[in-house]
Amino acid sequence: MATFKPLIADSLCVAYGKADVLNSVHVEINPGEITCLLGSNGAGKTTFIRALTGLTKPHAGTIQFDGLEITGLPPHRIVSMGISCIPEGRRVFPAMNVEENLLMGAYQERDRNRIRERLARVYDLFPRLKERRT
């Protein structure tokens, strides 16, 4: 099995115009960990996710994933590495069931066995999703 390195945001700073939203944020997420961002409206949760996924460019700091510098990469490159986010509140694919939504995350993966393994892992981590898959 491959050994993966953490996702690290180090000294991350993001601003919209003159308004600083993230100021020297440091987050390290190790393989296998589940991490939750909590905060009030305007705390920077969405901005942080947008920076991780390449949708918003930080003006300082770095983002590394699996030992590679990904700061400033275009979103499609970051998605191809396995990092993405779908905002639940937007109901992006409302007609799809849970499993169909999860399989959307594997649209670039061609190895059917790998897709099945990843889906099984998600269901092991989140049994409620398995109960509601169809």
Roles of regions detected by a PLM:
Residues L38-S40:
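The feature captures the beta-strand-to-loop junction immediately N-terminal to the Walker
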Residues L7-A9, L22:
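Conserved structural motif at the start of ABC-family nucleotide-binding domains
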Residues G17, T35, L73, V98-E117, ...:
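ABC-type ATPase nucleotide-binding domains, specifically the catalytic core motifs of the NBD
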Residues T35-C36, C85:
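Short beta-strand immediately N-terminal to the Walker A/P-loop
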Residues T53:
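Helix-to-loop junction immediately C-terminal to a conserved catalytic motif
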Residues G61-L68, M81, R114-L119:
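Conserved ABC transporter NBD signature motif
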